[in-house]
Design a protein with these regions (language model features):
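Acidic/aromatic-lined carbohydrate-recognition and catalytic surfaces
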Residues: 4, 10-180
Length: 183
């Protein structure tokens, strides 16, 4: 907890966020999605759009949505940064939700995790399949001299020791370019 008066504007930042009332939603929980991604599409994210008028009436200026990208389980194990998790719906569903929120003057902020990805991330899957021959092997911190706890035939760095969260090599310009292209 902190007082708004304690916030100091950093040089070059927009002032709107310092005076905003934020509302945070973890869509995977809020929308009641299955814990594990079974690939079955559902239009659950539309539930957030149903709350747009209520949020506007509360005086909410911005909504923070925890990860909504295609993921293996909890959202922080991203498979695809360009696609809404099928358990939540489609990119078109998300666009509709944004329009409803914007009609109530509610901004949308996405929680994007760009430090690591899930084991289902397309480039990591390519490394699992092709090993040394994968053009994406340098996208991760990998050693072909060891083995992972998943018996991949190579060792890799997982975020904070969590090997379902594959750490990206952010020193690789191709990785950075890919991530910037996604945002």
């Amino acid at each position: 907890y902190f007082q708004r008066s304690e916030l100091k504007q950093k040089e070059g930042t927009s002032m709107w966020a310092y005076n905003e009332t934020f509302y945070q939603i973890y869509p995977i929980g809020f929308c009641g999605v299955p814990v594990h991604n079974d690939g079955v599409p559902a239009h659950r994210i539309l539930k957030i759009g149903d709350w747009a008028e209520y949020l506007g009436n509360l005086g909410i200026g911005s909504i923070i949505l925890n990860p909504i990208f295609e993921s293996d389980n909890h959202g922080y194990d991203t498979r695809d940064f360009r696609k809404i998790d099928c358990r939540l719906g489609t990119n078109e569903d998300f666009s509709e939700v944004c329009k409803k929120l914007h009609s109530q003057n509610v901004k949308v902020i996405l929680d994007g995790v760009f430090n690591h990805v899930g084991r289902g991330f397309w480039a990591f899957r390519d490394v699992q399949e092709k090993k040394w021959d994968s053009p994406y092997k340098d996208w991760f911190h990998i050693s072909f001299d060891g083995n992972s706890c998943y018996n991949d035939g190579f060792w890799y760095e997982g975020w904070e020791g969590h090997f379902e969260l594959v750490k990206l090599n952010l020193q690789n310009p191709a990785v950075v370019d890919y991530l910037l292209d996604c945002v």
